[in-house]
Structure formats: structure tokens, C-alpha cells
Amino acid sequence: MKDPIVKKTEEKMKKSVNSIDEELKKLRTGRPSPALLEEIKVDYYGVPTPINQVATVNVTEERSLIIKPWEKNLLNAVEKAIQASDLGLNPMNDGNVIRLVFPTPTTEQRQKWVKKAKDIVEHGKIAVRNIRREILKELKDLKKNGEISEDDERRLEKEIQNLTDKYVEELDKLFERKEKEIMEF
């Protein structure tokens, strides 16, 4: 059975890595993805509402997204929300659906996105290491108070370090995958 301290550490680190993974999914890659629109809110009867709660978003094969609002009167609101976002895309409203065409990104844009992905992953690594530092301090306090032995402290420190290495490696893999996704075209 796992030690509660190790279990708590693993849960925190996993949560941190999952958060970074979600952030990377929202990063633009030149490839259309409905996840890019998750943060955009549409004025739905005075309430800011995510696009995916008022419309269907589909990826088409020709490098575009099709947004079909469930209510036709939302077309203009969805279009305005996309224009106001920082995606830099020009929505085309044909009266029934909104089409978002993703132009082929320049090498410079791709490099900028890779740098952004690297920054996001670096923040994740810092979070994982901060969790390790916090838990190691907890272990020192437990030993100082006589709640655990020196052998237990060393064993737990080693387990915590192994978890840290595991999750930092996982973050590196997430970055490599995202970098590959950004650079391929």
C-alpha cells in the first residue's frame, strides 16, 4: 500500500500535469480544433456563454471549423465573439453557419507557438518541483517532531524524487508531442 504522503504528492503532480495538458490543447497549432473556441464566450440573452454550449463545432477536411448555432439569431453574436477574441481568425457568416478557415501558418508563427508551448510546459515543471519542495519540507517537519524515522524520511524522499522525475518526463513528452503537431505541415 502506498504511503498517504506519496499518494497525496502523486495526486497533486498528476493534477498539475493534467492542467498543463489542457492548456496545451488550447494552444493554436495551425490545425483546426474545437478546443480553440472553448474560452470564447457568446452573449446569450445577456449571459456570457461558451460557444460549445450554444452551437455545434465541427472540423472539416479543408482546414476549417464549421460553427452551427442552435438558434439562428445567435449567428451574429458568435461571429462578433470570434472577431473580438485573440485568435486572429476571420469568421465567414453565410446565414446558416460560420466558417473559420485556418491559413497555413508561417514558420515564424510556428516557432512562436513552439516557444509558447515550451513556456507552458516550463510552468508545469516549476509547479511539480514546488510540490516536491512542499512535501519534502513536510517530511522534515514530521521527522523533527518524531512522527517518522530517518529511514522512512529517506525512503519517502526517494519516492517523491522518483515521482518528480516521472512527471517532469511526462511534461517533456507532452511538449515533444505538441512541438511535432505544430511543426508538421
Swiss-Prot record:
GO molecular function terms noted in the UniProt entry: ribosomal large subunit binding
Pfam families per the UniProt record, alphabetical: RRF (PF01765)
Cell location: Cytoplasm
UniProt record, GO biological process: translational termination
Domain of life of the native organism: Bacteria
InterPro entries: Ribosome_recyc_fac, Ribosome_recyc_fac_dom, RRF_sf
Keywords: Cytoplasm, Protein biosynthesis
A single Gene Ontology CC term: cytoplasm
Coiled-coil regions, chain positions: none
Family, as annotated: Belongs to the RRF family.
Function according to Swiss-Prot or TrEMBL: Responsible for the release of ribosomes from messenger RNA at the termination of protein biosynthesis. May increase the efficiency of translation by recycling ribosomes from one round of translation to another.
Alphabetical list of HAMAP family matching this protein: RRF
Name under which the protein is recorded: Ribosome-recycling factor
